Amino acid sequence: MKRFVATLPLLTLTLLLVTGCSESGAPTDGDGGSDDSGGGLLKVSGKEAETGNYIVLGTLTDQFDRAQAKANVEDTLARHSDIAAMVGLFAYNPPAILEALQQADRLGEDQTVQVIAFDEADETLQGIKDGTVYGTVVQNPYMYGYKSVEVLAALESGKTDVIPKDKFIDIPARQIRKDTVDDFWTDLKAKVGGDAKNDTKEGKPRFAYVTNGVASFWTIASKGVIAAGNKLGVNTDVLMPAEGIADQKRMIEDLITRGVQGIAVSPIDAENQVDLLNQAAEKTRLITHDSDAPKANRLVYIGMDNYTAGRMCGELIREALPKGGKVMLFIGRLEQDNARLRRQGVIDALLGRSADNTRFDPADKVLEGR
């Protein structure tokens, strides 16, 4: 998910094209001319979705800029009046979708756009209760935080058996619909309520939990970090970089200098952070959470299988649109391991493909299918 605010004035569009029944170049209007009216959005007028036929118009990225996230939705509404579903793949995307739809008077009894979500923002859960959001796929950020501290503390005490052979501790995602949202929300509120703090414990190890940004998702995770620290009698720090990859780099370098006993990090751009992460791994215990860095020397990844979670989201889209339709995906960025896998899982499930987490649809083709 990533979840911090960074200012980026330009709209970034990564086309996701759905392979299935057919594959083509960029969609055109009825007379074969492409839409170059600006903004980089695809136009698929004159190509109506047939029964059970899904057309993914593209994926709009916002680089974690909330204003841009909303602008992406507004542009989509302006260019695709017959859009059937909007899918928000990071925690703040569904609220941005709902806000834009509300201002466009597209929510309520006559709502024609299905909203499918990721994560458990209050606006998303309330939308499921109200019927303006079909459903969401939720992670378990509280357990991401709790388990990260638990594993680091175990390693500090010499218990290496906490690391599975595949170096992956799975905290499964789940689908939330209207019939389960009340119970889920009640449980969530119970976990994150209160203002517990992790007071300094003299002579005890210190572990750092580094997020990839600032968001309510990470506030939930921080509650798990604090709870585990207090239960296990260790010191914990939660660091949320508000200014992107450079900010996260500075934090990790500072933690290395300080000599903390362990770092749990959600890499912003794992491909380009391998050297930094390996530097940390040489000096302390390094694990990843939420988004992995499989090429780095991390000890274990704690999180969900993002490809599987993406497929779960694709299933929700198919439920919401049994007759097919045009779909737009919204996400922060695609440089992250979790984002790429999540997006691909959505596409594959939406098209009824077999599971293959090594598949990656090219960005220069339009794909559609049933």
State what each model feature region is:
Residues 1-2, 15, 41:
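Low-complexity, intrinsically disordered short peptide segments enriched in small/polar/basic residues
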Residues 21-370:
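A residue-level marker of the well-folded mature domains of exported/periplasmic proteins
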Residues 16-20:
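C-terminal motif of bacterial Sec signal peptides marking the signal peptidase cleavage site
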Residues 1-9:
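Bacterial N-terminal signal peptides that target proteins for export
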